């Protein structure tokens, strides 16, 4: 069987996927070690028997709904190839909106940045890459996530970021010009938890008590004790939680509170500035 034939058959199997053709190309690229552009340009190339066996195993798992990122162990975020595992949430493109807002509000001079619930290290590494003059601290309660984030930093030779294990602000001290977080914010009863890729991701990285608001509220309540005067707090949240997060920030004394849209035009990131 050649590349072109396998891609066609695989894409037809991935009916549950939003991007079946892309999924097939990623799997074939992973197994053959060839770039996706090569696969399309040389579609008549024959696949070896060993590669076909491996591809069939991966295709079966994808057909059952297992995320592509877990199958190949990698997901790109902010043009950074990040290793991923089942211990972490898979980085989403919409989280890049938070990175954009953070970069737009960081002071021009070197400063300290805090990323809470870092997972793969996506937000921390993106900010550390763009602002090599800044010191980035990133925290996660999951030891496996911290180890993975450190691996990503080493792989990408990013040396201005430090990863710590602990619950939210517990392992950190001092103040920061900006605190960013993509915490768990999904209600435990949300039916979407039983659909698509989310079924395979760790619920501890997705679900929060109090209808998804508990961790957001905990971060907002503690953040003033860790922000520089004029510092910013930026939170990713669910598309229906913007008003609730805005109220949390305003009630805690934040000003310039606003919500930004994601790439799908949904409310996704709410931010506020601590008193100057």
UniProtKB/Swiss-Prot annotation:
Belongs to the protein N5-glutamine methyltransferase family. PrmC subfamily. SUPFAM superfamilies: S-adenosyl-L-methionine-dependent methyltransferases (SSF53335). Gene3D superfamilies: DNA helicase RuvA subunit, C-terminal domain, Vaccinia Virus protein VP39. One of its GO terms (biological process) is translational termination. Keywords: Methyltransferase, S-adenosyl-L-methionine, Transferase. This is Release factor glutamine methyltransferase. The gene is prmC. Methylates the class 1 translation termination release factors RF1/PrfA and RF2/PrfB on the glutamine residue of the universally conserved GGQ motif. S-adenosyl-L-methionine binds at residues 117-121, 140, 168, 182. Transmembrane segments: none annotated.
């Amino acid at each position: 069987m050649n590349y072109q034939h396998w891609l066609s058959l695989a894409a037809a199997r991935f009916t549950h996927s939003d991007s079946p053709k892309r999924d097939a190309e990623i799997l074939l690229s992973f197994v053959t070690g060839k770039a996706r552009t090569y696969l399309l340009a040389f579609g008549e190339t024959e696949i070896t028997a060993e590669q076909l066996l491996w591809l069939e195993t991966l295709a079966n798992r994808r057909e059952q709904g297992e995320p592509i990122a877990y199958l190949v162990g990698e997901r790109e975020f902010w043009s950074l190839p990040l290793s991923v595992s089942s211990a972490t949430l898979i980085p989403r493109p919409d989280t890049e909106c938070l990175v954009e807002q953070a970069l737009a509000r960081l002071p021009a001079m070197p400063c300290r940045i805090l990323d809470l619930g870092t997972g793969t290290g996506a937000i921390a590494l993106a900010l550390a890459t763009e602002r090599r003059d800044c010191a980035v601290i990133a925290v996660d309660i999951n030891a496996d996530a911290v180890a993975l984030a450190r691996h990503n930093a080493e792989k990408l030779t990013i040396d201005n970021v430090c990863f710590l294990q602990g619950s939210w602000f517990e392992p950190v001290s001092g103040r920061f010009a900006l605190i960013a977080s993509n915490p768990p914010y999904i209600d435990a009863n949300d039916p979407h938890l039983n659909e698509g890729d989310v079924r395979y991701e760790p619920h501890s990285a997705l679900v929060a008590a109090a209808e998804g608001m508990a961790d957001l509220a905990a971060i907002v309540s503690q953040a003033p004790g860790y922000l520089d005067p004029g510092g910013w707090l930026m939170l990713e949240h669910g598309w229906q939680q913007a008003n609730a997060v805005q109220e949390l920030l305003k009630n805690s004394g934040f000003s310039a509170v606003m919500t930004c849209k994601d790439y799908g035009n949904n409310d996704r990131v709410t931010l506020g500035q601590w008193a100057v």
